[in-house]
């Protein structure tokens, strides 16, 4: 079973949604049968790599509210995050363009580290107040994930993974995503937003009921073997 999660490193609800999904997945009886894939999405593809505003100022400008109102709005997010064991430090966060951070996720995916890199990026931005558009930050995250930071620098200085990021952003829109986080289960069920863990558990159970593996009963329990044709022979002479 496959769960694809579209998110942006800059999105506070995406990190919260990630934790709530993980909590739901932890309660799912068949969690070992679930493949989780983190997909790329950019809330602001035109964001600067060297932002002029901090998070409070950026949101105040975008939504036409005062800085004080912006701080109050973010206080609620800090509380939600804390309830999940996450530490949000908005006062020091640097809201830079996330495109290269998404390229790092794809670099990680190419080396079997997609999920680890996504987690490290969220922590770097929300908790550690790292500048996730800077090469040295991304190289440090790569190293923390057990990847080659010099190979990452070569990749980021080329066109590597650019089309993959753009394609996933476009695909989210094609699937009907109006925002992130956006969860798609087996390309059939979509869950939008940082829902509570029980919502994710419900959709996982529903999907599993539809795709659960076929159970072949053991004929030995009846004392007789069923008659079959194999690839190269039919047991006609053995018919009763």
Language-model regions, residue ranges each:
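Glycine/alanine-rich phosphate-binding loops at beta-alpha junctions
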Residues: 1-2
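C-terminal cap of thioredoxin/glutaredoxin-like
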Residues: 5-7, 13-30, 38, 106-240
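Structural alpha/beta surface segment adjacent to cysteine/selenocysteine redox centers
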Residues: 19-125, 222, 234-235
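Short, N-terminal intrinsically disordered low-complexity segments that are rich in Pro/Gly
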Residues: 7-10, 14, 45, 66-67
């Amino acid at each position: 079973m496959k769960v694809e999660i579209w998110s942006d490193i800059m999105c506070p609800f995406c990190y919260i949604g990630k934790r709530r999904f993980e909590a739901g997945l932890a309660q799912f009886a068949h969690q070992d049968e679930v493949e989780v894939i983190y997909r790329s999405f950019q809330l602001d593809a035109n964001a600067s790599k060297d932002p002029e505003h901090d998070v409070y100022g950026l949101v105040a400008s975008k939504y036409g509210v005062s800085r004080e109102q912006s701080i109050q709005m973010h206080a609620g997010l800090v509380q939600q995050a804390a309830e999940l064991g996450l530490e949000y430090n908005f006062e020091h966060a640097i809201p830079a363009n996330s495109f290269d951070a998404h390229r790092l996720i794809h670099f990680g995916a190419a080396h079997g580290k997609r999920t680890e890199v996504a987690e490290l990026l969220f922590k770097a931005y929300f908790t550690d107040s790292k500048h996730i558009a800077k090469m040295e930050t991304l190289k440090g995250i790569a190293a923390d994930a057990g990847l080659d930071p010099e190979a990452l620098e070569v990749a980021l200085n080329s066109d590597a993974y650019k089309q993959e990021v753009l394609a996933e952003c476009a695909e989210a829109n094609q699937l009907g995503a109006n925002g992130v986080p956006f969860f798609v289960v087996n390309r059939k069920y979509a869950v939008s937003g940082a829902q509570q863990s029980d919502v994710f558990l419900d959709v996982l159970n529903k999907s599993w009921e539809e795709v659960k593996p076929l159970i072949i009963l053991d004929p030995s329990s009846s004392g007789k073997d069923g008659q079959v044709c194999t690839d190269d022979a039919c047991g006609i002479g053995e018919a009763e």
